Amino acid sequence: ASVKNTRFLTRERTDGTDDQWIFLPALGRVKRIAASAGGGSFMGSDFTYADMASTTYDTTEAEHTLIGQETVNGRSAYKIKSIPYDPTAYVQTIIWVDKEHDLPLRVEFFEKDPTTVSKVLTTDDIAFVEGRWITKSVTMTTVATQHSTRVEILQAKYDIPMNGAYFTTTFLETGRLQ
């Protein structure tokens, strides 16, 4: 199915929860994503709506433990176990973070059982853009089916003024500033 002109908006609230909306051209309208649907597949992909908001936790959202140091795809990485205080989508993640660039190289997601990996996110490409290292493409693989979905950042711009109207459901629906 074509995803052309599909638009997705996530806004983090002050209480740490997210509001999410999606515009699907086939429906011609904006649809709010219920918080309970966060674990649902994002447009039939291996990503969930919760994954699209974030795949990591800050220190107020999870307990983080350094459990080792390993090499991932030739890069030296910290291996960190994160257990969220409020496990909604995942009960645990294990993240390999590039020591030099502070980017995730691999993330293992545990949905219900902290001993069984459900999904694996791998970083396929990183790039130096406008003075910072960024993740350019990632692949999420569902372990049970070995099906995967690749997401690629085609363009990134930083430190530019942004009109708040971009972050509204009106813009989501029309694709134009009012």
Per-region residue spans from a language model:
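Surface-exposed beta-loop interaction hotspot
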Residues: T55-E63, I67-Q69
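Short, solvent-exposed mixed-charge patches
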Residues: L177-Q178
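Gly/Pro-enriched, hydrophobic low-complexity segments
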Residues: L9-R11, D19, R29-I33, G40-F42, ...
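N-terminal mature ectodomain segment of secretory-pathway/periplasmic proteins
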Residues: A1-A26, T65
